[in-house]
Amino acid sequence: MAENNGAVPPGCKLPAGGFFGRLHVLVVDDDAAYLEELKLMLLLAGYAVTGKTTAEEALKEVDQNPEDYFHIVMTDVHMSGMDGFDLLHRINGRVPVIMFSEGEDVVMVMRTVMNGACDYMVKPMTSEAIKFIWKHVLRWRLSALPANASSSLQPSDHLAAALAAVAPPPPPAVQLPAAPAQAGNRDGEAHEEAELSTQPPALVPSGVQEAAAAVWSSRGDGQEAPPPAVAAAAKAPSKKRGASEVSDRGSNNLEATTGRKKVRTRFTWTTVSHTSFVRAYEQLKDQEGPKKIKQLMELDGIFVTKTQVSSHLQKYRSWLENERKKEEATSSSPCNPLSYTNCLDRGYSTWKQSSVITEGQQSSSFSGRPIHSMATSNGCLTTTDTQAGNYVGVGAKEIENFISSHQRSLGTAIGQESTIEQASLHSEITSVSRDAHENGNSQARGSAMSNGTSGTRGVLVTNENLLHVVSASLPSNMGQPTQPSQSFCTNELAANYSIISDQNPGTSHPTSSSAINNQNSKTQEMSVSQTVELGCGNDVMLDWPELVGLEDQLDNDVLMNSFFDGDLLQQGVVTAIDGTQEMLAFDSTGDLGSVPPRGLNNEIASHENTNGKNGASSGP
């Protein structure tokens, strides 16, 4: 029918003819490169194309071929020789003409329309604009209908008549040779032969041929006979279920489709639909299948199929299973701060919330703090005051292991404003390979054991637990004459082995050596009860490990007065008086009672004091 002189690239498949069969487009442009590009776009859009580089050749093609050979002409405005306007005037309305140019000039657009062009396009044209040029052909066909026919038709009938006017003729009937008859299958073969010999329907939308037949019948007796396609449409039976049909997909390419079941569109799960699904799932408690869930979702106004619900249910159950496995893995992890039972640290499992003292005025001093179970059994009380909380136990190893293993779960116990700062309180070498008491510095700045500080910042023994430290550690120094003790945190300590090592030869005793960092095989617990005779003099100081760093009597006096505020001493107290300083000592059975309100530095009337252990009196 049409001349396809455009080169189709390899691999490109031309679409099938639409409801016009295939519109034939005559393209005219003196730019050969753009002409080939435009021809290719038209071919891929489903049109038959003939291209010419001059208006003279295009006019010659229109004159030589029948009237319906070209359905539309596309021409450039500016061409050498005969331009687009000259070609438009020579065609004289026989074929609809679309004019195009590079410039989008309003004057040019108005001029082309006023001269009879059906449309004006700007170069370069897009494939979307090319695809819908069939609308101009349809509009031109509608305008060409007879006046008497158009007045008696509805708007929909106008469209049907225009389509019928350009409908292609039906293809010739296919005649197949008859196959040799076989016994038993004659009736079936005759039926198949009759079906093959029937004429296939033309590719015309439903209702178009009937409307066209009505148009031709209304022309009267003097009109010519309708085309064969229209006459055949008037006699054609109505379409049955399952028969092929033609559908318009937004372009002129209408393909014949069978009466198969239509594919449902894909359902997109949104937040609203998923919320309704979860609500239905939880209401049924996973006891019903997709059918019940679908019914509950329909109550919320969400309509889905059973297959869609089943697919979403499988995905949701898989997601729940993965979340459950993640939760189990997290809860069973040994590093999980919330998993106390699975922790491998033995010391950690023995820490609990309880109180060291269960009776008396100080029963609530340590209430609500993590306390080791051994703190109440061995009599050696060690405290560490931190910003996160006070930990009370028997030794620094327990505290260090507890803090270093679980500092991320219970808050950082080693850090700023903490008495333990990147070093162990009672160990030889810290976790970062530093001596705990290198160069005489016990811990952090402002510690109770450095620079002679009386314990204003970072003090090891706090006010609220001093009495318990005294009662737990003091009896180890009783029973022998006491001499002035040396500093507890000096460079003379042998390899800094012990933080509380007694360097005074007068008070040195196998049982009074280091109670925590034991470097002597003969040493014992500091809590072993020993009798100590209290000495007298201006330099008398009790060798209390918990009161390390008190290098002068003034600091000692200030600290003791600040700690023993009120009635805290009772009978069984031995007081050593040297005029300006008093020191206290208790045996293992000493009762912490009350202190006279005058304080420890005031002069006592009687210089005779009774030893709480053996009742011996001590001289002034």
Curated annotation (Swiss-Prot):
GO cellular component terms, semicolon-separated: nucleus
PTM characteristics: Two-component system major event consists of a His-to-Asp phosphorelay between a sensor histidine kinase (HK) and a response regulator (RR). In plants, the His-to-Asp phosphorelay involves an additional intermediate named Histidine-containing phosphotransfer protein (HPt). This multistep phosphorelay consists of a His-Asp-His-Asp sequential transfer of a phosphate group between first a His and an Asp of the HK protein, followed by the transfer to a conserved His of the HPt protein and finally the transfer to an Asp in the receiver domain of the RR protein.
Keyword DNA damage: no
InterPro entries xrefs: ARR-like, CheY-like_superfamily, Homeodomain-like_sf, Myb_dom_plants, Sig_transdc_resp-reg_receiver
Disulfide topology: none
Polar residues bias locations: 431-456, 603-620
Region (Disordered): 171-197, 215-257, 431-457, 501-523, 596-620
Residue positions, PTM 4-aspartylphosphate: 76
Subcellular location: Nucleus
Main localization of the protein described in the UniProt heading: nucleus
Keywords: Activator, Cytokinin signaling pathway, DNA-binding, Nucleus, Phosphoprotein, Transcription, Transcription regulation, Two-component regulatory system
GO MF assignments: DNA binding
Record flagged with keyword Lipid biosynthesis: no
Highest taxon of the lineage: Eukaryota
DNA-binding region: 261-321
Disruption outcome: Dwarf, narrow leaf, lesion mimic, low tillering, altered kernel color, viviparous and low fertility phenotypes.
Response regulatory domain residues: 24-138
GO BP annotations, alphabetical order: cytokinin-activated signaling pathway; phosphorelay signal transduction system
Similarity section: Belongs to the ARR family. Type-B subfamily.
Biological role: Transcriptional activator that binds specific DNA sequence. Functions as a response regulator involved in His-to-Asp phosphorelay signal transduction system. Phosphorylation of the Asp residue in the receiver domain activates the ability of the protein to promote the transcription of target genes. May directly activate some type-A response regulators in response to cytokinins.
Protein name per its UniProtKB record: Two-component response regulator ORR27
Organism: Oryza sativa subsp. japonica (Rice)
